Structures are given as structure tokens and as C-alpha cells.
From Swiss-Prot:
Record protein name field: 3-isopropylmalate dehydrogenase
EC numbers on record: 1.1.1.85
Family, similarity comment: Belongs to the isocitrate and isopropylmalate dehydrogenases family. LeuB type 1 subfamily.
Positions contributing to Mg(2+) binding: D228, D252, D256
Lineage: Bacteria, Pseudomonadati, Pseudomonadota, Gammaproteobacteria, Vibrionales
Record site feature (Important for catalysis), residues: Y146, K196
Binding-site residues, NAD(+): 79-92, 286-298
Length: 363
């Protein structure tokens, strides 16, 4: 029993966001009951509903609430209703990106695994998916070619050109590498750093700095892999990977590939962290407005996002493992929502939340 209290800013957002967030609340209620942890939770508008109620996708009151909290549990934003707005005023770009910038969330964590009983959903061959895999992609989120200067277009005709610049500072690589190694210590103690050090100067520095940081983690095994080989190895033998450490653009590619080979995007959580371990936790999927309000959405990604919050921002590893174990038990027992049930009877969104909370309390 930890007898600790944490303040959580809860931002359900749009589409299926409120429905799946309600299930995360059930699970956190169960954690409170079992572990003696107290979560002070307040819900605030973000995204399309914030546009409707406040005239902008990210009200100042929501930002203030996040600043006063230990972590942010985020649902999903966006939908056809707001697509007519200018791009910067739409829910996705007007809410998530400013939040990441305001809180300097430089690290993105994307776990991807095949749960027992769901191997058939993977597009991989049965002999590969049957071996299972459990990977966390640690992606640098604020540097690299997406943000480097100069970038632009100039000239005309045959001489017209476009250019982007890949830039990484030593401190940016150091801080993301430390999170990768610390994450590995909580798992199977292996880090594979992805780069293109046979071609790119930025990757040469990346590899040098990662090697230096590795000296502080002698208990963690470090390997390096070129990005082109890594994309092939993920298809051939994903079980070889534990923590994959990536730059911004390589992490963008690798995390989506990892998501695809699980075969179940509705199951994948995501975390974005800053240097003080403050984090924003959200499902990797979208707001799915086509199924909103039907009580059929899969809440597992939202629930597992809450587990990541407990692990990385709150330091409650035992509670995080309880949630993940409860999810695995439910899935192994064939308790599935409509996206996974095929020809079997499907659980509703709320029934799935009830089941996972029940497994936590009975474990």
C-alpha cells in the first residue's frame, strides 16, 4: 500500500474519446481500491468539443489544469464537424501540437506487442507472430529533419529545388538515450539504437553519444542497426527487439510498422514525456467518429495509456503491471470487443472496462 495521491488532468476529447476514457476511470478506480493510491481527476475540454464550448481547440483553462497536474490522460480529438476550419484551428493541430510544445515533450514511447490469442490478427506469417513480440519504440520527438533549419523551396523550372535539414544536438541525443536505457531496465534490458551511421553525419553523432550513455547502464545490452535493416528485421523476427531507440523520422517509420504488425491498432497506447517525466498519455489511434456513441469501441489502448502514466510519470510500477496483466487475462480469456471478436459474441466498450477492472481487483 503506497498511500500516495496524484493529480491527473483528464482530457477525453472527441469521438470515442469520452467512451473509452470512462473505462480508464474504472480501471483507475480499481487501482485506487487495490493499491491505496488516490487519483484526483478533473476532466477538461480539448479538441472539437473545446471549439464548440470555448471557441478554440486548447482553452487556457485546460492548459492551466495540465500545468497543475502530475500527468495528462488524453483521449482523442477531431472529426468531420471541424474539418472545414483552417488547418491550424482544427482539433488535431490546434490541440496536440501546442500541448507537446508547451510542455516540451521531447520523447515519444510507443509499445507494441502481440497478446496471446490475437496472433491471427497480425499480417505476419503464423510461425513468426506465434513467437510473439513485445517492443517499445523510444522516439525523439522535437529534433531532427522535421524541425531542422534551413528548410524550404526555391528556384523555378528545371532548377526548382526543395530542401530539409537533419540537425541533432548532443544534449538532445543524450536525454532520449537515457530514457531508452531506463525503460530497458524495467523490461528485458536490451536497447537497439536505429540510425544510418554509414551515410549521415547526424547518425554518426547519434551512435557516438548513445555509446557514451550506454557506459552508465552496464546492465543493459546495446546494439546498433541501420534503419533499412531494422525495417526488414521487424518483419523477419520482431521477437529479437526489446527497446528500439530512434531519431524523429526513423521513429515515425518504425513505430507505425510496429503498430501494423500487431494487427490491432485499437490496442496500442502512447506516451510523450519531458525531462521532468511529466507526460501526456493517449491511444495511438484516432477519434473514430463513425463508431462514436455506439458503445462498441475498443478501450484497451486508453486503459494501457493509463498504465504507462502510472509507470513513467508516477513511478507506480506495480500498479502499471496490474493493469497490463488484467488486460492480458481478459484477452486470453477471449473477452474481446467488436473489432477483434470476428464471429464470436463481442463485449461492449463498457463491458470490457468492467472486465479489466474486475481482473485487477481479483488478482
Amino acid at each position: 500500500m503506497t498511500d500516495k495521491s496524484y493529480k491527473i488532468a483528464v482530457l477525453p476529447g472527441d469521438g470515442i474519446g469520452p467512451e473509452v476514457m470512462a473505462q480508464a476511470h474504472k480501471v483507475l478506480d480499481a487501482i485506487e481500491q487495490k493499491h491505496g493510491i488516490s487519483f484526483e481527476r478533473e476532466e477538461h475540454d480539448v479538441g472539437g468539443i473545446a471549439i464548440d464550448n470555448h471557441g478554440c481547440p486548447l482553452p487556457e483553462s485546460t492548459v492551466t489544469a495540465c500545468e497543475e497536474s502530475d500527468a495528462v490522460l488524453f483521449g482523442s480529438v477531431g472529426g468531420p464537424k471541424w474539418e472545414h476550419l483552417p488547418p491550424n484551428d482544427q482539433p488535431e493541430r490546434g490541440a496536440l501540437l501546442p500541448l507537446r510544445k508547451h510542455f516540451q515533450l521531447f520523447c515519444n514511447l510507443r509499445p507494441a506487442q502481440i497478446h496471446a490469442g490475437l496472433e491471427a490478427f497480425s499480417p505476419l506469417r503464423a510461425d513468426i507472430s506465434g513467437r510473439g513480440f513485445d517492443i517499445v519504440v523510444v522516439r525523439e520527438l522535437t529534433g531532427g529533419i522535421y524541425f531542422g533549419q534551413p528548410k524550404g523551396r526555391e528556384g523555378e523550372g528545371a532548377n526548382e529545388k526543395a530542401f530539409d535539414t537533419e540537425v541533432y544536438h548532443r544534449y538532445e541525443i543524450e536525454r532520449i538515450a537515457k530514457i531508452a536505457f531506463e525503460s530497458a531496465r524495467l523490461r528485458r534490458k536490451k536497447v537497439c539504437s536505429i540510425d544510418k551511421a554509414n551515410v549521415l553525419q547526424s547518425s554518426i553523432l547519434w551512435r557516438e553519444v548513445v555509446e557514451e550513455i550506454a557506459k552508465d547502464y552496464p546492465d543493459v545490452e546495446l546494439s546498433h542497426m541501420y534503419i533499412d535493416n531494422a525495417t526488414m528485421q521487424l518483419i523477419k523476427d520482431p521477437a529479437q527487439f526489446d527497446v528500439m531507440l530512434c531519431s524523429n523520422i526513423f521513429g515515425d517509420i518504425i513505430s507505425d510498422e510496429c503498430a501494423m504488425i500487431t494487427g490491432s491498432m485499437g490496442m496500442l497506447p502512447s506516451a510523450s514525456l519531458n525531462e521532468s517525466k511529466f507526460g501526456l498519455y493517449e491511444p495511438a489511434g484516432g477519434s473514430a467518429p463513425d463508431i462514436a456513441g455506439k458503445n462498441i469501441a475498443n478501450p484497451v489502448a486508453q486503459i494501457l495509456s493509463a498504465a504507462l502514466m502510472l509507470r513513467y510519470s508516477l513511478g507506480e510500477e506495480a500498479a502499471a503491471q496490474d493493469i497490463e496483466s488484467a488486460v492480458s487475462k481478459a484477452l486470453s480469456a477471449g473477452e474481446l470487443t467488436a473489432d477483434l471478436a470476428s464471429d464470436k459474441p463481442a463485449l461492449t466498450t463498457s463491458e470490457m472496462g468492467d472486465k479489466i477492472a474486475e481482473y485487477i481487483l481479483n488478482s
